[in-house]
A protein has these predicted regions:
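Conserved phosphate-coupling serine/threonine residues in phosphotransfer and NTP-handling enzymes
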Residues: 17-19
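Asp-based, Mg2+/Mn2+-dependent phosphohydrolase catalytic module
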Residues: 3, 9-11, 21-22, 26-121
């Protein structure tokens, strides 16, 4: 799914996380995805304000030289969804079963998916 998004977006994808950069990079390396995001990782720890504020998403959009309204945010928490919505982005939520979808939709997610194979633009 990440490779598909990377190709579809011509490499213009980023990670915007509330976690610290070291942890994010470590996780991406462990799962073999670091190459898709090299130089495009943004941490809330490095922003004036972290989620639920939109700063990390706004920084990622600015780096990609795109309007946040043209960005798709993929989130798994209500705090992250709130941040994505505040940035003006379209937000989709990932919820591993048996997670409840209602809180994610109430926070502003436009769509909830339960498996990465469902992630198609």
């Amino acid at each position: 799914a990440v490779a598909h998004l990377h190709d579809h977006c011509e490499g213009r994808i980023a990670v915007a996380s509330g976690a610290d950069r070291f942890k994010v990079e470590m996780m991406l390396r462990q799962v073999g995805l670091m190459g898709f995001f090299e130089g495009r990782i943004f941490s809330g720890h490095e922003m004036p304000r972290s989620k639920p504020h939109p700063d990390v998403y706004l920084a990622a959009a600015a780096h990609l030289k795109t309007d946040p309204a043209r960005c798709l945010v993929i989130e798994d928490t209500t705090v992250g969804i709130t941040a994505g919505v505040a940035a003006g982005a379209t937000v989709w939520a990932y919820a591993a079963p048996p997670a409840e979808h209602a809180p994610l939709l109430q926070a502003g997610a436009q769509r909830v998916f339960t498996g990465m194979q469902q992630l198609r633009l």
